[in-house]
Amino acid sequence: MIQSFIITGFLGVGKTTMLTNTVKKYFKNKKIAIVVNEFGDIGVDSKILTNVHSEVLEISEGCICCKLAQEFESGVSEIVNKYNPDIIFVETSGASEPFPIFLSLQNLGISIEGIICVVDAKNFDTYKENSTAKYQLGGSNIIILNKVDLVTPAELEEVKKEVIQIKEEYNIKNNLTGETVFNNYMIHYAEQGLVNKEVFEGVYQIDEVIGLAKDYKHLDHTGKDSITQKVAYLKENVRFNDIDQLLSALPKSIYRTKGIVKVTDVPNPIFINYSFGDASYEELPEYKEKSLLIFIGESIADDVKLLSQKFPFLILPQFSINK
């Protein structure tokens, strides 16, 4: 039977990095398929993961829920029939909860080895009140505290305490018995997106057919903490320092920025990964498309417009993505 893992977690917590490192380190001799649920219709993470493995299916629009379940299931079925992979990894959008994906994989008869929620130990305090983040924890049976090398032992202990509290409050329940589903969840630690192989050895396999979770309501993503995305393209003749200055000027409302840009003083296109004030860069020699940046946050339309005025190399489309 084909195995699967669902990788969930809030925006910018390090899901793609963890998945990339996992596939490279532990599954070199396995046939791996990766399904990416991007936020919006421009897939940056899928381009990164394609560099690691060729079988990457992208499901856009931000959330695999009722309207996308059929697309997701047909896409996964096509992967199964065409490639017959040993393991399927599904990386959810940071703006969506994992439970609808769980149901779809169950419908397909695929063994779900674990629902892994990645938590940013350094920045957890900045997003812990977001309802999506809470449902992500509640719908998981494996929790990875990432970036533990960037916090003190006391800070890590406080994050762990808060994670457990949210997990127990938002844990999904069987709608037939009313019992909590993931009582035996596990917490692991990760530094720079690398976790122990034990996480992926199937010791947490989910055998129970849950059906719909008790009191489960799919988030409509239109509430006060709903997440907005804006896309900007870049003019030519942009220098690396221009990008660095832009990222330094981002307001707190924009807590996630990613994209791939071409700059005049670096030979290859650069993948930019910014979250909560921290930025990392990686060269992508194979990228041939336009330079673009994706800004993600809460109520950011005016902020992005101001950025385009301050940094004229940003080009805002006439119709920006707002989902």
Kindly give the residue locations of the regions a language model identified.
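Phosphate/Mg2+-binding loops and adjacent switch elements
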Residues: E78, K82-A190, V195
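Nucleotide-state-sensitive switch-loop elements of NTP-binding domains
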Residues: I2-T8, V13, T17-Y127
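Helical mechanochemical/support elements of P-loop NTPase systems and associated helical scaffolds
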Residues: Q3, L68, E97, Q136, ...
